[in-house]
Amino acid sequence: MSNSSMSVVILAAGKGTRMYSDLPKVLHPLAGKPMVQHVIDAAMKLGAQQVHLVYGHGGELLQKTLTDPALNWVLQAEQLGTGHAMQQAAPHFADDEDVLMLYGDVPLISVDTLQRLLAAKPQGGIGLLTVKLDNPSGYGRIVRENGDVVGIVEHKDASDTQREINEINTGILVANGRDLKRWLSLLNNNNAQGEFYITDIIALAHADGKKIATVHPARLSEVEGVNNRLQLAALERVYQSEQAEKLLLAGVMLLDPARFDLRGELTHGRDITIDTNVIIEGHVTLGDRVRIGTGCVLKNCVIGDDSEISPYSVLEDSRLDAGCTVGPFARLRPGAELAEGAHVGNFVEIKKARLGKGSKAGHLSYLGDAEIGSGVNIGAGTITCNYDGANKFKTIIGDDVFVGSDTQLVAPVTVANGATIAAGTTVTRDIAENELVLSRVKQVHVQGWQRPIKKK
């Protein structure tokens, strides 16, 4: 292996016709982010000095979606093959760097495999990622003489004898920038497809006396590409199965690994239990002994020790201290914070609000733009009226406050410690400490009331 720096080229110019979509193929999501983003992330983890993204179809949308300033955008106006794509990027290659070639629609390539490929590359030669298949039909074959790689022949151009070869080209390779630029300049399109094949550089390198080293990926799924939605769905299942296996081996109890989706990163403590059909998005941290019920969605959350999220609750950009309970059917929106032992029950929505230690909102309530103290009881149907149609206002509730059912708190308003709000009250003014507040229409009784009769 050379000691030179390394850059990466990601080919992402294809139309993806078989996806039957207006979305560029490489932007279709896998595990919650675009396919090509998985490849970009791998390149960054490798320590690439620069990442060149070769684009064509849907370039404007690609650039709008992939906002990493480290990307160097290279246009391939016509799709004339992989060799042609690399020719567009070649002017950006430094002579003394290694250039690693990856694909935007091969999303599961691992950093470990790429590190082995870089390590195996001979000084001045080429590192080539290959696999052996029981049925290699349709793939380029690795041609060897006396064990040494001398070329790659595409399936359509292969002889009957060459088609018996079961070692195939994955398309992933690494070579020196100076040599690669020269070989790319020598490519032609005299083949059955009429395209410029990057694979032809293998024969050119052999003719120059360069060594070609091969490496196999740890798993076949690492080099499987996506051309249609069926293949994308299959790779999604492969990815999720791998993530579930890692979590199980790390001590997380997934009650059904086949019905768990990780679409981000999960940091966890000990003795976690996750029921079926749970989705984890973004960055989620679970403390010790956390229990997640079936059908929950957690995105960018921190969940404290001994907390429980009951079924079908949705939490986003929220933070729970130890011993909290949420749900079932609760929604915590961005900015929701629950102090130790707080409880949020069914059909309660919290947004940009903090619920203090031991406080409870059990049923059918909306708490937005609020600061709620400790030991507070929020009755069913309580609403913080935080929006006047133009601006948001805050509700402040002190400690040990009792809020009766069907209460409306019209912000901005402050409720002091120990206050009691009777059921059905609309609060429009601040409430002092230990006050009882109620606002109701006087109850009227009409004896012998006759209900209206429906006209026939």
UniProtKB/Swiss-Prot annotation:
Mg(2+) binds at residues 105, 227. Residues 1-229 are annotated as: Pyrophosphorylase. It is found in: Cytoplasm. SUPFAM superfamilies: Nucleotide-diphospho-sugar transferases, Trimeric LpxA-like enzymes. Its cofactor is Mg(2+). UDP-N-acetyl-alpha-D-glucosamine binds at residues 11-14, 25, 76, 81-82, 103-105, 140, 154, 169, 227, 333, 351, 366, 377. It catalyses: alpha-D-glucosamine 1-phosphate + acetyl-CoA = N-acetyl-alpha-D-glucosamine 1-phosphate + CoA + H(+); N-acetyl-alpha-D-glucosamine 1-phosphate + UTP + H(+) = UDP-N-acetyl-alpha-D-glucosamine + diphosphate. Pathway: Nucleotide-sugar biosynthesis; UDP-N-acetyl-alpha-D-glucosamine biosynthesis; N-acetyl-alpha-D-glucosamine 1-phosphate from alpha-D-glucosamine 6-phosphate (route II): step 2/2; Nucleotide-sugar biosynthesis; UDP-N-acetyl-alpha-D-glucosamine biosynthesis; UDP-N-acetyl-alpha-D-glucosamine from N-acetyl-alpha-D-glucosamine 1-phosphate: step 1/1; Bacterial outer membrane biogenesis; LPS lipid A biosynthesis. GO terms for cellular component: cytoplasm; membrane. The keyword rRNA processing does not apply. Binds 1 Mg(2+) ion per subunit. The active site is at 363 (proton acceptor). Residues 230-250 are annotated as: Linker. It is an enzyme of class 2 (transferase). Its EC number is 2.7.7.23, 2.3.1.157. Catalyzes the last two sequential reactions in the de novo biosynthetic pathway for UDP-N-acetylglucosamine (UDP-GlcNAc). The C-terminal domain catalyzes the transfer of acetyl group from acetyl coenzyme A to glucosamine-1-phosphate (GlcN-1-P) to produce N-acetylglucosamine-1-phosphate (GlcNAc-1-P), which is converted into UDP-GlcNAc by the transfer of uridine 5-monophosphate (from uridine 5-triphosphate), a reaction catalyzed by the N-terminal domain. HAMAP family: GlmU. In the N-terminal section; belongs to the N-acetylglucosamine-1-phosphate uridyltransferase family. In the C-terminal section; belongs to the transferase hexapeptide repeat family. This is Bifunctional protein GlmU. The gene is glmU.
